[in-house]
Amino acid sequence: MSLLSNMISIVKVGYNARHLQVIVQNSKLCINVLSVLYKLGYIRGFIIKDQKNITILLKYINNKPAVRNIAVISTPGRRTYLKHKKLEKFLTKKDSGFLILSTSKGILTDEESNMFKIGGEALLKIN
């Protein structure tokens, strides 16, 4: 299991158990994804404890998790790459969510990658 998949699994369990914080393994990719989630207001923040661990401060709105659903799209066994023209088709109009992509400009949301007109590896889908 990749570190990103492991982090998402721990975050899901933390939200289901109503924890205020969870601890995950440290990696550059996880820090970049957490930075995007923090910037968009889906977590209260994160603290890099040491070289091995990150504490994620989970966010609740009216006693409900800020993240309704989070899913890993690209796995080590099956990478999913999207061109910027295909991004709109990937999310249906009913979805209020967004994608997090790994691009040549770094970790971006689908809106940001559309602005830059670049595609990339689809990492996560968040509602």
Curated annotation (Swiss-Prot):
Keyword line: Mitochondrion, Ribonucleoprotein, Ribosomal protein
Keyword Translocase attached: no
Molecular function via GO: structural constituent of ribosome
Highest taxon above the source species: Eukaryota
Gene3D superfamilies: 3.30.1370.30, 3.30.1490.10
Entry-linked Pfam families: Ribosomal_S8
Coiled coil start-end: none
The UniProt record lists the keyword Mitochondrion: yes
Cellular localisation: Mitochondrion
GO biological process, one term: translation
GO CC entries: mitochondrion; ribonucleoprotein complex; ribosome
InterPro entries: Ribosomal_uS8, Ribosomal_uS8_sf
Family: Belongs to the universal ribosomal protein uS8 family.
Protein name: Small ribosomal subunit protein uS8m
Natural source organism: Acanthamoeba castellanii
Lineage: Eukaryota, Amoebozoa, Discosea, Longamoebia, Centramoebida
